[in-house]
From Swiss-Prot:
Disulfide cross-links: none
Nucleus keyword on record: yes
Residues in TAFH domain copies: 290-386
Lineage: Eukaryota, Metazoa, Ecdysozoa, Arthropoda, Hexapoda
Pfam family, one: TAFH
InterPro entries, alphabetized: Histone-fold (IPR009072), TAF4 (IPR045144), TAF4_C (IPR007900), TAFH/NHR1_dom_sf (IPR037249), TAFH_NHR1 (IPR003894)
Name of the gene this protein is made from: Taf4
Protein name (Swiss-Prot/TrEMBL): Transcription initiation factor TFIID subunit 4
Amino acid sequence: MNTSQTAAGNRITFTSQPLPNGTISIAGNPGAVISTAQLPNTTTIKTIQAGIGGQHQGLQQVHHVQQQQQSQQQQQQQQQTQSAGQPLLNSMLPAGVVVGMRQQAPSQQQQKNVPTNPLSRVVINSHMAGVRPQSPSITLSTLNTGQTPALLVKTDNGFQLLRVGTTTGPPTVTQTITNTSNNSNTTSTTNHPTTTQIRLQTVPAAASMTNTTATSNIIVNSVASSGYANSSQPPHLTQLNAQAPQLPQITQIQTIPAQQSQQQQVNNVSSAGGTATAVSSTTAATTTQQGNTKEKCRKFLANLIELSTREPKPVEKNVRTLIQELVNANVEPEEFCDRLERLLNASPQPCLIGFLKKSLPLLRQALYTKELVIEGIKPPPQHVLGLAGLSQQLPKIQAQIRPIGPSQTTTIGQTQVRMITPNALGTPRPTIGHTTISKQPPNIRLPTAPRLVNTGGIRTQIPSLQVPGQANIVQIRGPQHAQLQRTGSVQIRATTRPPNSVPTANKLTAVKVGQTQIKAITPSLHPPSLAAISGGPPPTPTLSVLSTLNSASTTTLPIPSLPTVHLPPEALRAREQMQNSLNHNSNHFDAKLVEIKAPSLHPPHMERINASLTPIGAKTMARPPPAINKAIGKKKRDAMEMDAKLNTSSGGAASAANSFFQQSSMSSMYGDDDINDVAAMGGVNLAEESQRILGCTENIGTQIRSCKDEVFLNLPSLQARIRAITSEAGLDEPSQDVAVLISHACQERLKNIVEKLAVIAEHRIDVIKLDPRYEPAKDVRGQIKFLEELDKAEQKRHEELEREMLLRAAKSRSRVEDPEQAKMKARAKEMQRAEMEELRQRDANLTALQAIGPRKKLKLDGETVSSGAGSSGGGVLSSSGSAPTTLRPRIKRVNLRDMLFYMEQEREFCRSSMLFKTYLK
């Protein structure tokens, strides 16, 4: 009998003596009280022993104790008290649980005097172990010696027999059991013959579906590498294979809530061997299930695309687009199902949404890694994958539990593990140092798509400057071609020619604008746009352009060159005179901000330009842009007209220059002017242009054969016939052009004959009765038909009178035997019999016709045309009096009568023998 003693500090020390067969005795000091408070849990003890090479070799030993504690029994046991000599336990074994162990039978090769290693003990925590008040020990009968060691557990469903294996180990080892429950109780057992590390995780019943426990433990399951063990574990715990250097025995105790105990237990009883084994391969099953799920989703989408190919093209395109949006996570599964039902007119599928939510992440990852391919569907982008794609890129690190000695303690909520990372050769190597894994909120940054930042050029505000009239300072911003390009601001200072300088006469000045390279690229706070230069009189084209750039960068951006402007000397001279008059009138400038819109490739923006405008005098006024002309009052319009007269009085060249620069303003101000005046200002001669347009008609008709000739007849046969005729007459063989001309003549002749026959056939099928221009003069057929109807009516009236007479004679009951009366009765009976026979025959015919089915009578084209035209013609004539539209058949049939009529009308055939032979047919 094994005894136990209670030491100070709530520690129970077990001796190293072996347990007797089938008996576990638990006794305690009367003065010691062991108290634990636990929620109803399901505790699983897993011990995985790795054998060590040497003289002592043993089998793997697996102990599974699965026990479910009921809250009602626990409360009843907590309320019971015991007498003196028995300790008080708040949590004890239920009444129906029996635990027994039996030592392994010695083999035949072993000697009997050699002592065998004792069976490893099963350590039960304080909230599980207890003693019933009346039964201090639990005893089982000894099992048969021929059987393997087993563990018998009694549950609510009956007894269960679990196999137990023994092993050997070094004699001097210390075992530490750390209880990380809410009570923080510690039980130590010394002098155990194996090296064992036990992690106990207690999950409260209230947090059954979450990974957060009361003590926030992180459990790392590890299996020794020297043996293979079958262990049953919940699906949310992952088992990793690690190589232990010393092959220790690792026992893991996991306490799971009572609500999940029924689903996590596996009870199998074998009738032949009497043993039950629990085998689980959660990782392989999960991988297979995920593969099947994403394959089903791929087949579903592929079949959907294949079915959409039978639909019209727009439907097929919409289905493909919808599936691509679903793969790219642009559409939720609910919206996908709704749109798919509307596209294909299908019935709703409520189970499809859940299936898509479960399988779409796996399918997206498989499409991204090219594991699966759907025809016509592109893989999703990387940012759609999220954590799924990140987990594939991160390296997988294996973890090994670091053994903890008796003197070492760990903080609640942390677990010390040793990380094994693969080296360059692929073999795992342990890293130096220790890693503490604690429960912290996840801090993972997902890779997101790069953002495009729209930066334009920084625009510097130029204040109004008081400068002489020879300069215009304008700020210009170049166009932006891409979102990532940065444009800079450019200052262009335009200097005008002095008033006293006069250009050389009879010369054209050519100025090229836009040959400037921008070297400053600075970020902008405004969207890029193009801006016009000024709203006043434009600068003279004979200016030298000077670009002043404020920058420190060396990047160059080319500006598209503008066309060369050519102006006559008279226009330049008039322009300078106008500038001089404006300079004498006023010595100050009014700076204005003009907002204009400039068309560009990008959306138009309102651009403000700080420009120096010309002074406004008493009699002169600058022309506003065309957009403002509509809102100008009458007085301002009169002033502008006076300004225009003053400008045009200086000469024809000055007016031409003004019209060149401000053509849009003048056109909007004066409305639709004479086109000749506008053309004359632009230097266009309308008479010359019209003569050129009319002169191109000379080339029409110069090339006769614009396309290749198509020969109607067979050219070799025709040439052979012509050769035979010319050889008989002793003539030379003609060229090929003669045969081509004969073929064209024959084609034209046949075309004329066919056209005439078509007209004759149309006249033949014409219905003259439907023509409103004709009136019937004689209708002999109608008259004969009317007389026939009169005769039929008279005959019917006589038959009715005779029938009535016969019926009256048949109904008479005179007793006088009259031979005439008898004949009339006989005739009446015969007539009735004939009527009955006729009715019976009619009924039989109707029945037979109904049995055969409806007869479809094919209507001829002529009948359809005549009947349709006749039925519609009466209504049309009666309502509107216009001619009805006669439906002509598209196919024209020409018969022999039409051919005879044609031959009678033609001069070549009217006296030919062919016509008379045709008469005889």
